[in-house]
Amino acid sequence: MATDGTGVVTVYGSGTNGAALLEPSNHKSATFSVKVGLAQMLRGGVIMDVVTPEQARIAEEAGACAVMALERVPADIRAQGGVARMSDPGLIRDIKRAVTIPVMAKARIGHFVEAQILEAIGVDYVDESEVLTLADDAHHINKHNFRVPFVCGCRDLGEALRRIREGAAMIRTKGEAGTGNVVEAVRHVRSVMGDIRALRNMDDDEVFSYAKRIAAPYDLVMQTKQLGRLPVVQFAAGGVATPADAALMMQLGCDGVFVGSGIFKSGDPARRARAIVQAVTHYSDPKILAEVSSGLGEAMVGINLSDPKVERFAARSE
């Protein structure tokens, strides 16, 4: 993990190289730096999906750094099918009133009006999410048009840098939400980290052709090479169901973890939530991980992703 020596990730756009992201508008560049800084405040934390104010309070008491307000967790979206849209603003307001930690909410990819509504009701972060049904299969939201920070998913370095160019202040792996199966999240993290390791060994001439090959902006590719990491915080998401899963993602180099269906589809949600928070905090200590993993009851029932009938949410956009 590249830091400034104090354990803090370098904020993209805060230096002369970073200013290239949003040229020629210095105002936009400053605004983006603020949004990246807000996302960076969640580093080292766990963000939990909740569907009621009571679940939100359980998440806060367990030590979550933020909650994601939803009408249905991803496991229910998979099971029930149909069109998945932005949650009812009234529900989001109720969840906001119930907790003191930041509240996120999801908008459909490309649906900038849903994002406008979420910003208007005061959510702290918007997740432009492939878990919801696509609204636009050709365009993502121009996130620079908003004051609220955005979270976006990725499967590889090129996808991550394209979302950052659009204004994403936080990147998460897509994984396969609602499955309780961490294999795709691991694949996506390893892909991003492997691409960055390869990039660091390239000379500057090679970076031009590499940026074209992965369809990513050259300036962002070069900055990623210099930092040795993404220019924004990177969280793991999609299939994280146990404390061991969460610690695995942290050891692979993530800055934090999203946990969706894995908590409130388990046998003892409050205890599992506390255990996952502890696992993220102490991810490199196997003794603590063994202790917090004990006596949690049944984990959520997972889905075998080798089954070709399983819908792949992660493939919904690039």
UniProtKB/Swiss-Prot annotation:
Q: Which Gene3D superfamilies match?
A: Aldolase class I (3.20.20.70)
Task: Tell me the pathway.
Answer: Cofactor biosynthesis; pyridoxal 5'-phosphate biosynthesis
**Between which residues do disulfide bridges form?**
none
Q: Which InterPro entries match?
A: Aldolase_TIM, PdxS/SNZ, PdxS/SNZ_N, RibuloseP-bd_barrel
Recorded GO molecular functions are: amine-lyase activity; pyridoxal 5'-phosphate synthase (glutamine hydrolysing) activity
Top-tier EC class: lyase
Which Pfam families does this UniProt record tie to the protein? SOR_SNZ
Query: What reaction gets catalysed by this protein?
Result: aldehydo-D-ribose 5-phosphate + D-glyceraldehyde 3-phosphate + L-glutamine = pyridoxal 5'-phosphate + L-glutamate + phosphate + 3 H2O + H(+)
Query: Transmembrane segments in this chain: where?
Result: none
Keyword Lyase listed: yes
Q: Which family does it belong to?
A: Belongs to the PdxS/SNZ family.
The remark listed among the other comments is: Vitamin B6 is an essential quencher of singlet oxygen in plants, that can protect cellular membranes from lipid peroxidation.
Kindly provide the name given to this protein in its UniProt entry.
Answer: Probable pyridoxal 5'-phosphate synthase subunit PDX1.1
